[in-house]
Amino acid sequence: MTKVLIAGFAGAMGQQAVTLVKSLPGFELSAVVGHHLTDLDPTSYGLENSTTVYADREQVETGAADIWLDFTVPAAVFENVSYALRHGMAPVVGTTGLSDEQVEELQQLAKQNGLGGLIAPNFGMSAVLLMKFAKEAAAYFPEVEIIEMHHEDKKDAPSGTALATAKLISENRPAHETAPDSTESLPGARGGDYQGIKLHAVRLPGYVAHEQVLFGGSGEALTIRQDSFDRSSFMSGVKVGLEKVGTLTELVVGLENVL
């Protein structure tokens, strides 16, 4: 049995992940981590007695799990993944907010410890396809902006998916800035900027996770959109990550790179 630890198990994504892991043949939910919990009885959370509950990552010992599945918060994810790698656990990371420099540092740490892992800005298949299609379209439509819409509790902006989309687009189009002479009567009105690609973040109740990539050309426009209406939509990608991570020899970024 492959032992899985879920960090951030009490959150919305964490709860979906708990249900998934418990249903997967060949996988065991060996441990969970919830920040500053006072009740460490697994049955209080609907878990088996065999599942260890930790209130802090520093309490997790080597051998507690084979896989560290992270659905925590941007402020904690770097230290969480570092801890997992130093203690022999292959990370599968759904938490966003890691900088490029932090990802590179984690990749080096994974190499030093002989572990593979997966960092996925989005586990939804529709989002993965959106990124793929947007990259292809950028070769023909260099004028592009991105709008991402999420629930009001999402901490980081822009979303990891929107930023990953911008990075992929920038790989497949010449250096370009849309409307460079535009001015803002309200600071921030034109959104954030990644290599000339404007990114706009919406945070509102009623939304889960949504993204639009808008391309403009002479006399025409192209919009690529994906919508995640329920967090269960991400679990097919999490399942792939859990099943594939044991075959990886490096820390991979992007679910599309293990499909």
From Swiss-Prot:
An annotated GO cellular component: cytosol
Subcellular location: Cytoplasm
Involved pathway(s): Amino-acid biosynthesis; L-lysine biosynthesis via DAP pathway; (S)-tetrahydrodipicolinate from L-aspartate: step 4/4
UniProt keyword terms in alphabetical order: Amino-acid biosynthesis, Cytoplasm, Diaminopimelate biosynthesis, Lysine biosynthesis, NAD, NADP, Oxidoreductase
Domain of life: Bacteria
NCBIfam families: dapB
Protein name: 4-hydroxy-tetrahydrodipicolinate reductase
EC number(s) stated in the UniProt entry for this protein: 1.17.1.8
Record: residues binding NAD(+): G8, F9, A10, G11, A12, M13, G94, T95, T96, A120, P121, N122, F123
Record's function text: Catalyzes the conversion of 4-hydroxy-tetrahydrodipicolinate (HTPA) to tetrahydrodipicolinate.
Record's catalysed reaction(s): (S)-2,3,4,5-tetrahydrodipicolinate + NAD(+) + H2O = (2S,4S)-4-hydroxy-2,3,4,5-tetrahydrodipicolinate + NADH + H(+); (S)-2,3,4,5-tetrahydrodipicolinate + NADP(+) + H2O = (2S,4S)-4-hydroxy-2,3,4,5-tetrahydrodipicolinate + NADPH + H(+)
Family affiliation: Belongs to the DapB family.
Organism: Limosilactobacillus fermentum (strain NBRC 3956 / LMG 18251) (Lactobacillus fermentum)
GO biological process, one term: diaminopimelate biosynthetic process
The gene coding this protein: dapB
Gene Ontology molecular function, alphabetical: 4-hydroxy-tetrahydrodipicolinate reductase; NAD binding; NADP binding; oxidoreductase activity, acting on CH or CH2 groups, NAD or NADP as acceptor
